[in-house]
Curated annotation (Swiss-Prot):
One of its GO terms (molecular function) is zinc ion binding. DNA-dependent RNA polymerase catalyzes the transcription of DNA into RNA using the four ribonucleoside triphosphates as substrates. In plastids the minimal PEP RNA polymerase catalytic core is composed of four subunits: alpha, beta, beta', and beta''. When a (nuclear-encoded) sigma factor is associated with the core the holoenzyme is formed, which can initiate transcription. GO terms for cellular component: chloroplast; DNA-directed RNA polymerase complex; mitochondrion. It comes from Adiantum capillus-veneris. Zn(2+) binds at C69, C71, C87, C90. Mg(2+) binds at D489, D491, D493. Coiled coil: none annotated. It catalyses: RNA(n) + a ribonucleoside 5'-triphosphate = RNA(n+1) + diphosphate. Its cofactor is Mg(2+); Zn(2+). Its EC number is 2.7.7.6. This is DNA-directed RNA polymerase subunit beta'. It holds the Pfam family RNA_pol_Rpb1_3. The gene is rpoC1.
């Protein structure tokens, strides 16, 4: 059994035939070696007890009842002594029945078969290593083609090379007349091969280091090769480069992990523990079983038939043996990955079997459903909605969820402040909703961050830390700018809330995981907290002029750009005057106005350096220069004495909010702008300026 205290990580890789066998094989005190499943039976049709050496054998997988053997004898599980722990008649161990959840068996195949994951998946690892087309390899695996293999340092009688079709050869019916059956079989085994044997020999003959060196040299030569200008030739060169890169990566992985390519061909099939593929008895006495049991039975039936054919090969036609090898390969394919690039195997009711791949893959598979998707304490889940009034590092938690998540902390606080005498009294106060509870909860939440996670967690920004705030309702509220990191939308998406318990977890959340510290993508460095959708529309509506867009048709008395200087517009000397006028409803967000601008600030517009459209000079030497968006008053010496910009109240409010939100950035980065959106380039510039200041 795997104990979580002994193992800190899990690595998935290829297993050698000896390792697969060692998973299940063990020796009894009487010297018998058990573990091999060689009978296709499951339960006896009358007694419903496991059959010996079958798929539910108690000798191999353990007793169905704790301390009870197949004979019905009972003995304590804690009895000491090797001989007393086994029944001498049936060989069943007197142990806990829970061992049937992790004890495995194995099926010894009469012929090697190719693992369908490494053959038919895209990209095909076997095809990449052998540098052969996938269709040819599939024909070889399923015994449609044969491969010539002359014995080393011996002359080849048939003079065959490469792949060929056995049925098309004329000598197939001539040679048996000149050789005895035994000699002809020996000749055939030395000269030709098909099925998993051919794939295993090809993979075993690879020298990975020399293979890697040759592939690397060829890739270097192809990189130096220039395009010839012909489309199909250039495409062929690119495909060859991609193939070489895949082969180099694959060879490096095999060398790094000390795994052998021939392990992709199976000699032993591991049999899952019975509790993971159960047979359930219904009330009427009927039995329902897992599809894996039926697939295992097919493999054992076909494998036993092939073993009988091979044991009497002198009298068995060659075509029958080849056909049976193909059936064994198809049965193993159906068990591991039914329907990969083909039709799945079906039962008598035309229902496709559920293979091992379908059991472990997908959202409802073994990994995501049972291992990664476990329910954990101090967590909750709810729908997310937008919270525009929140700060970037804040989230709104419903009161009902927050009191459940922080109940232990609230109880400790109540008892520590002598507001409750014991645990029962504190829980009673929480259940009744005493008003003091919410004050204590706010105090607890003030110093405790929470983690928000949206599945699937594809990158680091899929889980971030926030400062929780109590809100009404039953939905979690988020600042609209943080949705980019989660790849979430406010259209019904759900997010999980986790409470970090240890001090180390809380420190990590505050220093590394807070949302305002994760504004850039860790993969590309691009900003992820950028306005989109309704935020862009709101910024557009805030910064639009009364003579533009939808307001052009709504307000008939709009001002033309030509007579803007001849029209009487409101003048304001500061932002505070404008704010007071806005609060008293003297101006709206879209009305044009003149605002006195500080001379030491720069306008983010190059038009101030252009020629003025009109200039007025006074006898005192002062001059007025009129531009498209501003007017400047200069002294006699040419210095600027005052400057007014043409803008709207909405733009000024947006610009001021932008400056206050980015106080740590250089003031030059946030001068007045007429842009209606906070673009990604603005955030890039702000980030660059802040880095320069640091």
């Amino acid at each position: 059994m795997i104990h979580r205290t002994n193992y800190q990580q899990l690595r998935i890789g290829l297993a050698s035939p000896e390792q697969i066998r060692s998973w299940a094989e063990r020796e009894l005190p009487n010297g018998d070696v058990i573990g091999q499943v060689d009978q296709p039976y499951t339960l006896h049709y009358k007694t419903h007890k496991p059959e010996r050496d079958g798929l539910f054998c108690e000798r191999i997988f353990g007793p169905t009842k704790s301390g009870v053997c197949a004979c019905g004898n009972c003995r304590s599980v804690n009895d000491e002594g090797e001989s007393s722990r086994f029944c001498k008649h049936c060989g069943v161990e007197f142990t806990d029945s829970r061992v049937r959840r992790y004890r495995m068996g194995y099926i010894k195949l009469a012929c090697p078969v190719t693992h369908v994951w490494f053959l038919k998946r895209i990209p095909s690892y076997i095809a990449n290593l052998l540098a052969k087309p996938l269709k040819e390899l599939e024909s070889l695996v399923y015994c449609d083609l044969f491969l010539a293999r002359p014995v080393a340092e011996r002359p080849a009688l048939l003079r065959l090379r490469g792949l060929f079709n056995y049925e098309d050869r004329a000598w197939r019916n001539i040679l048996p007349t000149f050789f005895s059956t035994q000699n002809y079989e020996m000749l055939r085994k030395n000269e030709i091969v098909t099925g998993g044997d051919a794939i295993r020999e090809g993979l075993a003959s690879l020298d990975l280091q020399s293979f890697l060196n040759c592939a690397y040299l060829e890739w270097q030569a192809s990189v130096k090769q220039k395009p010839v200008g012909i489309e199909w030739e250039d495409r062929t060169i690119r495909r060859r480069k991609d193939l070489l890169i895949r082969r180099i990566k694959l060879a490096k992985d095999f060398l790094r992990t000390n795994m052998k390519p021939e392990w992709m061909v199976l000699y032993f099939i591991p049999v899952l523990p019975p509790e993971l593929r159960p047979i359930v008895e219904l009330h009427e006495g009927e039995l329902i079983t897992s599809d894996l049991n039926e697939l295992y039975r097919k493999i054992i039936y076909r494998n036993n038939t092939l073993r009988e054919f091979l044991s009497g090969s002198e009298f068995t036609p060659e075509g029958l043996i080849v056909c049976q090898k193909r059936l064994v390969q198809e049965a193993v394919d159906a068990l591991i990955g039914s329907g990969i690039r083909g039709q799945p195997m079906r039962d008598i009711h035309n229902r496709p079997y559920k293979s091992f791949s379908e059991v472990i893959e997908g959202k409802e598979g073994r990994f995501r459903e049972n291992l990664l998707g476990k329910r954990v304490d101090y967590s909750g889940r709810s729908v997310i909605v937008v919270g525009p009034s929140l700060s970037l590092h804040q989230c709104g938690l419903p009161r009902e969820m927050a009191i459940e998540l922080f109940q232990a902390f609230v109880i400790r606080n109540l008892i520590g402040r002598h507001l409750a005498c014991n645990l029962r009294a504190a829980k009673c106060m929480i259940r009744k909703g005493n008003p003091i509870i919410w004050e204590v909860l706010r105090e607890v939440m003030r110093g405790h961050p929470v983690l928000l996670n949206r599945a699937p967690t594809l990158h680091r920004l899929g889980i971030q830390a926030f400062q929780p705030l109590l809100i009404e309702g039953r939905a979690i509220r988020l600042h609209p700018l943080v949705r980019g990191g989660f790849n979430a939308d406010f259209d019904g998406d759900q997010m999980a809330v986790h409470v970090p318990l240890s001090v180390e977890a809380q420190i990590e959340a505050r220093l590394l995981m807070f949302s305002h510290l994760n504004l850039l993508s860790p993969a590309t460095g691009d900003p992820v907290s950028v306005p989109s959708q309704d935020m862009l529309l709101g910024l557009y509506a805030l910064t639009i002029e009364s003579r533009q867009g939808i307001y052009r048709n709504r307000h008939l008395g709009f001002i033309d750009r030509v007579n803007v200087y001849s029209t009487k517009l409101l003048h304001f000397s500061s932002y505070c005057d404008l704010l007071r006028a806005k609060e008293s409803r003297q101006v709206d967000s879209h009305s044009l106005l003149w605002l006195r601008w500080k001379i030491d600030l720069q306008i983010i517009s190059s038009k101030i350096r252009e020629l003025s459209s009109e200039s007025h000079y006074e006898s005192s030497g002062t001059s007025f220069h009129f531009y498209e968006n501003c007017r400047i008053r200069k002294c006699r010496d040419g210095s600027i004495s005052s400057m007014y910009v043409l803008t709207t109240a909405g733009r000024i409010l947006f610009n001021q909010q932008l400056k206050e939100a980015m106080q740590g950035v250089s003031k030059n980065s946030f001068s007045y702008t007429t842009s209606s959106t906070l673009s990604t380039s603005t955030i890039d510039r702000c980030n660059t300026n802040s880095n320069n200041e640091e």
